Amino acid sequence: DIALSPAGEELLQTVRSLDDIWNRFESAIDELKGLKRGKLRVALVTTAKYFLPRMLGSFCKRYPDIDLELEIANRENIVQRLRNNQDDLYVMSYPPDDLDIVRMPFLDNDYVVVAPAAHWAVGQQVSLPDLAAEPFLFREQGSGSRHAIDRHMNETGTQLKVRLSLASNEAIRDLVASGMGLAVLS
């Protein structure tokens, strides 16, 4: 028998709720724009590429006369696009507080520590301070993930050793699997 882990069960429930969330979002867009045809420019952080394409397929079927233009970049670049008002919709964590914008919570973005299968902490309940002596692989400065991790470390006074910074969650996962260090990913 194959069974999902508790984290897998949580992910499954989250994925199942994405369609409902997207339908509510589509209705909100309808109300805001009365949009039936034209172009919708969407800028999203790189981590949103894991769930947004499925939702966009549903949107395109519902609104075949609306062309989508996507910009996928790290948080820093998306914030700059927001400041320049380049797009119609922005998908990110932690939008800037200094802008007068409408914020619509979309989806919880939980972070987890990723470790090689044989690591001593696998299966254990540990906190980030417990892992302070371990080398970490982080997303690059300017990414939403790095922003969230840095913010958490500043709030808690936690210091982690950064062995390497990368712009790819996939590369980070592969390097973690090879034993190069731990990571905190969404």
Which stretches of residues belong to each language-model region?
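N-terminal winged-helix
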Residues: S27, K33-Y63, D67-I72, E76-Q80
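Alpha-helical "hinge/linker" immediately C-terminal to small N-terminal DNA-binding modules
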Residues: A3-E31, R37
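Hydrophobic residues within well-ordered alpha-helices
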Residues: S5-G8, V42, L82-R83, L131, ...
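Ligand-binding cleft/hinge of the Venus flytrap
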Residues: M55-P64, Q86, P129, R146-Q159
